[in-house]
């Protein structure tokens, strides 16, 4: 099933003239790399599986033959709910070879998410593991088939246990001959639908063309001087933009090696880094924090590491400084599934840039900061961040109204993130438009208050959310996770700490909840809607006991 992609003719002509867009597809780039280095290791995972470029191509070609035999045509959606395994790349490449659209799904999704997303994207084939994390995902999906009428085939990825209820991927690869003729796909056609893991609401399907992905990853590799000599370590989920684009796609575009980790554990991650001599690691702030804590207690040889690229959330200064002391070059990157990545620091930027900014526009990308009416703001003023470039998505799948709100006719994507830009074009993300607490008419940035909380010596993790207040409308509530050595923290102690920080009193947290952990999605973002639900429930219980 094809999807009509609306391309702005002027933008398309400009990007083609500048060389960011062309006729070639991702499959064309794959074959260029394959011809150049067939015997090089392309991908390896922590379960011991590895493929050279040649063996990976043969496996993907066999799977492509099977997909075509099932009636799969260019534009049809193929979903795969896999962790960081080599088989993810096999399926992805098979989609490219057939012209099918890749729809990677998160392993953590269960019945509700799967039914909704698979129907939304009208997937015709789903690949799921026989077992993973003490569950059997394939057995979870089979009883749901009646609720997903468009799903024609379900394939069991029998990596950790045998397939008994669905066709096994391993057998399909053994029994099916390789594809003899590649399906021709144009660069303007849809390559992938990535469902955003937003902290609120149902996931939205972000539509990316081959040209979107190629321009994004080529610019990303160029800015960071990534080459065929590099080895990428990807601990983040491959169902998100970070893993899918930077952990799987970018390496094969430049002939590099991809090292995948299915379950993040700092010890396992460091062991892989040391064993495979990885040169770059990509992940959100929680990954960095956990690796740092582990390194401080159990040193590993990380001399091969060129840098750790950190995105998803702003890097706390303390973490950046600790990384520097441990010999880790920490670089900030900013982007979203809709526009990924579009701001990156330079490799040779001074530490002040890493600590105080989220980078500047990638090649071909424009960034501006706008007010509520979407008028550009002067340097230094806070407003909404917007980006335009060859990497920017084509809209949300079957969501024209949402697409129109986020993406204007001139190609600008409005992120919903609050931002400041300096005179050199470097940006600093300061929060979310929706992440503002309005207390008696005064706006409080949750990010600002969280940054102060994270400086408290007893606090390991923190989040600020609004709690309802009859008189002021909203007050701020702090959810904190304490460091292991500390057993308690009171609101009075927090207020005293804020007093020492000399910030306006209206920014002080007015309620404190100490928890064991904060709810995060797979990309590391705090799910604040769950915290808002929790504080409303807690307040209701307090009233009931009065």
PLM feature segments, named:
Residues 8-9, 132-187, 295:
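ANL superfamily adenylate-forming
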Residues 50-54, 191-215:
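Conserved AMP-binding A3 loop
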Residues 253, 278-283, 292-353, 366, ...:
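Gly/Ser/Thr-rich phosphate-binding loop
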Residues 109-116, 126-128, 281, 389, ...:
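AMP-binding/adenylate-forming catalytic core of the ANL superfamily
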Residues 152, 156-157, 503-525, 543-546:
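AMP-binding/adenylate-forming catalytic domain of the ANL superfamily
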Residues 214-231, 239-280, 290, 294:
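Conserved AMP-binding/adenylation subdomain of ANL enzymes
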Residues 38-39, 156-161, 174-195, 202, ...:
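Conserved pre-ATP/AMP-binding loop-to-beta segment of ANL
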Residues 22, 39-85, 89-93, 110-115, ...:
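Conserved AMP-binding/adenylate-forming core of the ANL superfamily
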